[in-house]
C-alpha cells in the first residue's frame, strides 16, 4: 500500500474519530462527515485510476452528488435547529418530531 493511500485512510479514520468525539454539536458532526466523504472520494478516484477500470469512472461523481445532497440537508437541518432552539446541539434533533 502506498503512502498516499495510507494518508487518505488516516484522514478517514481521523474524521471518524472526530465524529465520535465531537458529536454533541451538529456543525462539528457535519464537518467530520464531510471529511469522511472527501477522503472516500479521493481514495475511490485513486483506486479507479490505478486499476484502469474505465466502466467505473462515474462512481466518484455519483459519490460527489450524494455528498452535495448530504451537505444541503445537513445545513438545512442546522439552520432549522439553530433558529428554533438557538443552539446546534444534536440532542435537539429529537425534539423536532411531530
UniProtKB/Swiss-Prot annotation:
Enumerate the Pfam families for this protein: Oxidored_q2 (PF00420)
Question: What Gene3D superfamilies does the entry give?
Answer: 1.10.287.3510
Which EC number(s) does the record attach to this protein? Answer: 7.1.1.2
What membrane topology does the UniProt entry give? Multi-pass membrane protein
**Catalytic activity as recorded in UniProt:** a ubiquinone + NADH + 5 H(+)(in) = a ubiquinol + NAD(+) + 4 H(+)(out)
Q: List the disulfide bonds.
A: none
* An example Gene Ontology CC term for this record: mitochondrial inner membrane
> Where does this one sit in the cell?
Mitochondrion inner membrane
- Gene Ontology biological-process entries: ATP synthesis coupled electron transport
Enzyme class at the top of the EC tree = translocase
Membrane-traversing stretches: 1-21, 29-49, 61-81
**At the top level of its lineage, which domain of life is listed?**
Eukaryota
Q: Which InterPro entries match?
A: NADH_UbQ_OxRdtase_chain4L/K, NUOK/Mnh_C1-like
Q: Which UniProt keywords apply?
A: Electron transport, Membrane, Mitochondrion, Mitochondrion inner membrane, NAD, Respiratory chain, Translocase, Transmembrane, Transmembrane helix, Transport, Ubiquinone
Q: Name one GO molecular function term.
A: NADH dehydrogenase (ubiquinone) activity
- Its function? Core subunit of the mitochondrial membrane respiratory chain NADH dehydrogenase (Complex I) which catalyzes electron transfer from NADH through the respiratory chain, using ubiquinone as an electron acceptor. Part of the enzyme membrane arm which is embedded in the lipid bilayer and involved in proton translocation.
- Per the similarity annotation, which family is this? Belongs to the complex I subunit 4L family.
Q: Please describe the quaternary structure of this protein.
A: Core subunit of respiratory chain NADH dehydrogenase (Complex I) which is composed of 45 different subunits.
Q: What is this protein called?
A: NADH-ubiquinone oxidoreductase chain 4L
Amino acid at each position: 500500500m502506498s503512502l498516499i493511500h495510507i494518508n487518505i485512510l488516516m484522514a478517514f479514520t481521523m474524521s471518524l474519530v472526530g465524529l465520535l468525539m465531537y458529536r454533541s454539536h451538529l456543525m462539528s458532526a457535519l464537518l467530520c462527515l464531510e471529511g469522511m466523504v472527501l477522503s472516500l472520494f479521493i481514495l475511490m478516484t485513486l483506486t479507479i485510476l490505478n486499476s484502469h477500470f474505465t466502466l467505473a469512472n462515474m462512481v466518484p461523481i455519483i459519490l460527489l452528488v450524494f455528498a452535495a445532497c448530504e451537505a444541503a440537508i445537513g445545513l438545512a437541518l442546522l439552520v432549522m435547529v439553530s433558529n428554533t432552539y438557538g443552539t446546534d446541539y444534536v440532542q435537539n434533533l429529537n425534539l423536532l418530531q411531530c
